Amino acid sequence: ASWNETSIITASANGCNGPSTSTHTVTTTPTVGTPSFIAGATSIRCQGAETVVYDATAAYTTGITYTLNAASLGAGNTIVAATGSVNYVAGWSGTSTITASAAGCNGPKTAVHSVTITPTVGTPVFAFGAASARCQGANTVTYTAGATNSTGITYSLDAASISGGNTIVSTTGAVTYDAAWTGASVITASASGCNGPKTADHTVTNNLTVGATTFAMGASSTR
């Protein structure tokens, strides 16, 4: 089963002026190997328009051709059969499967490479919207945001607010305001993920506390 070299068969005919011989040469071609992708069996990429070449090799092959799964083709992606070059369209996310088929003796032999295309992270959206207002005073307010396809969101506070004694918890968006702080505070949410990070701001107007009413004539008068 493992023989893959040259065999020579010699026929010898006995008789007058013999023997007479002739030979027959048999070339035993090795069995084609299973293709192996240079990128391995799987890979991950971010959603976006791009061309990626998926090369495979195989022992004793007379040539390798490549195909792409039907769902990927249906979404507008294409493949060059001779090279394994896949052209991804901008809107595609999901799984693409490239199949390499190696021609040769006892072939073809095939192998697949699966690509997970991760969607682009969305722009964060604050639960409170783009802006809000509050009255001056010491308290803590949490400003949360969500983003599609995000692997995590972190929060930061503008430099002026930090200098004014206010603080923020970067993992939660919880802002602790100093009692004396007035003016604008800007909370920035940064969403991690494919083709990210993506950011959005929430602006808080911190209004002055209204002062006590004072009569021009004082607290009391006589008439």
Predicted regions and their residues:
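Interdomain boundary/hinge segments at the C-termini of tandem beta-sandwich modules
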Residues: 24-30, 114-119, 202-208
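A short beta-strand segment in extracellular, disulfide-stabilized domains
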Residues: 49-58, 138-147, 223
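Short proline/glycine-enriched turn/loop motifs at strand-loop junctions of beta-rich domains
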Residues: 58-64, 121, 147-153, 210
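A short beta-strand micro-motif common to beta-rich folds, especially ectodomain repeats
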Residues: 5-14, 94-104, 183-193
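Extracellular/luminal low-complexity segments enriched in Ser/Thr/Pro
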Residues: 1-3, 84-93, 173-182
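Low-complexity "stalk/linker" and mucin-like segments enriched in Ser/Thr/Pro/Ala/Gly
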Residues: 47, 65-86, 134-136, 154-172
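Proline-enriched interdomain boundary motifs that mark the N-terminal boundary
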Residues: 31-40, 120-129, 208-217
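Short, exposed coil/turn segments at beta-strand boundaries within extracellular/luminal domains
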Residues: 14-21, 103-111, 192-199
